[in-house]
Curated annotation (Swiss-Prot):
This is Malate dehydrogenase, chloroplastic. Pfam families: Ldh_1_C, Ldh_1_N. Homodimer. The active site is at residue 258.
Length: 403
């Protein structure tokens, strides 16, 4: 049976690992999308309706047929959602579509939207969507504590967007201060929540968040995640296009970091197994690494990769919620505190459970090709510099960090 990835349908297919190997196999979740004419979001169900006419439903029905031949019981969502999610930066280019996608989740009971301005309109708009979760808006620092009260998952896309000619590192000073301030509030108001960092540069903002949490005495490395899912989504998409494969079958692990050469797709570990020429490996690797710039240039100054980032982040949020809800087979790639290399943080496939990070998939770094091994050694230098930059920023006196 061909393996499948959770990338193509973030809320319908998840990766799991068989006991015999570290190779992921698809697991269908019990989710139903209504057909487009009467779309009402995601619904908990035991089977995809045979009368559903949307193309997505047809795809899911095909997946159900495959799943029914498996000896694994599909994971079922709770009928009554019970998780609170806060999006910090909800009025931004990523925050708005991300909030919409999270609003569709059957696991979310309450969606808190925070920003320094313009968030009331976003909340009003989303509140008209007839999905179960209730939407509340919070504006400005004075309302941030209330936004974070009793939240289970905090998602942070806040920050300035990339512009043509701007690298992720150019964003550092502005976004570093934003992340530092927001994570301080998280530490004070919901220290046990899962924290998802989207704000770039992730290679530095995650270490900043870790240092802030340490200073507050509430750091739990199992609950701090740098969201690198977009790199996996892109790798799966580009490989499926290059090799004319069904996207739902493709799974490419991506390790390292979340900027430039620190993004390393392990094409040799692509599932299903695919043969690449040296030229294809080079072409795909470079395209995946520079995909963000590809979008920035295409938008000609009008924005960055907001929609694909929102999609990827929503997938990661959904995975975290499933883990909190008791699904024991949740795997994603993420930039986390790790002992996989000699670096303190590293992106790789991880297992997520009720209490956060449960395991780092060590097999990701085993059996690498010569090309991948050289790329790994090369990325470590740049990644270490970014991590050190984040740690140094977090430990600056407040006045110096603000400059």
């Amino acid at each position: 049976m061909a393996t499948a990835t959770s990338a193509s349908l973030f809320s319908t297919v998840s990766s799991s690992y068989s006991k015999a190997s570290s190779i992921p196999h698809s697991r269908l979740q019990s989710v139903k999308f209504n057909s487009v004419p009467s779309f009402t979001g995601l619904k908990s169900t035991s089977l995809i309706s045979g009368s559903d006419s949307s193309s997505l439903a047809k795809t899911l029905r095909g997946s159900v047929t495959k799943a029914q031949t498996s000896d694994k019981k599909p994971y079922g969502f709770k009928i009554n959602a019970s998780y609170k999610v806060a999006v910090l930066g909800a009025a931004g280019g990523i925050g708005q579509p991300l909030s919409l996608l999270i609003k569709m989740s059957p696991l979310v009971s309450t969606l808190h939207l925070y920003d320094i301005a313009n968030v009331k309109g976003v909340a009003a708009d989303l509140s008209h969507c007839n999905t179960p979760s209730q939407v509340r808006d919070f504006t400005g620092p004075s309302e941030l504590a209330d936004c974070l009260k009793d939240v289970n998952v905090v998602v942070i896309p806040a920050g300035v967007p990339r512009k043509p000619g701007m690298t992720r590192d150019d964003l550092f000073n502005i976004n570093a201060n934003i992340v530092k301030t927001l994570v301080e509030a998280v530490a004070e108001n919901c220290p046990n929540a899962f924290i998802h960092i989207i704000s770039n540069p992730v290679n530095s903002t995650v270490p900043i968040a870790a240092e802030v949490l340490k200073k507050k005495g509430v750091y739990d490395p199992k609950k701090l995640f740098g969201v690198t899912t977009l790199d996996v989504v892109r790798a799966n998409t580009f490989v499926s296009q290059k090799k004319n494969l069904k996207l739902i079958d493709v799974d490419v692990p991506v390790i390292g970091g979340h900027a430039g050469i620190t993004i390393l797709p392990l094409l040799s570990k692509t599932k299903p197994s695919v043969n690449f020429t040296d030229e294809e490996i080079q072409e795909l690797t470079v395209r995946i690494q520079n995909a963000g710039t590809e979008v920035v240039d295409a938008k000609a100054g009008a924005g960055s990769a907001t929609l694909s980032m929102a999609y990827a982040a929503a997938r990661f949020v959904e995975s975290s919620l499933r883990a909190l809800d008791g699904d024991g087979d949740v795997y994603e790639c993420s930039f986390v505190e790790s002992t996989l290399t000699d670096l303190p943080f590293f992106a790789s496939r991880v297992k997520i459970g009720k209490n956060g990070l449960e395991a780092v998939i060590e097999s990701d770094l085993q059996g690498l090709t010569e090309y991948e091994q050289k790329a790994l050694e090369a990325l470590k230098v740049e990644l270490k510099a970014s991590i050190d930059k984040g740690v140094a920023f977090a430990n600056k006196p407040a006045a110096a960090a603000a400059n």
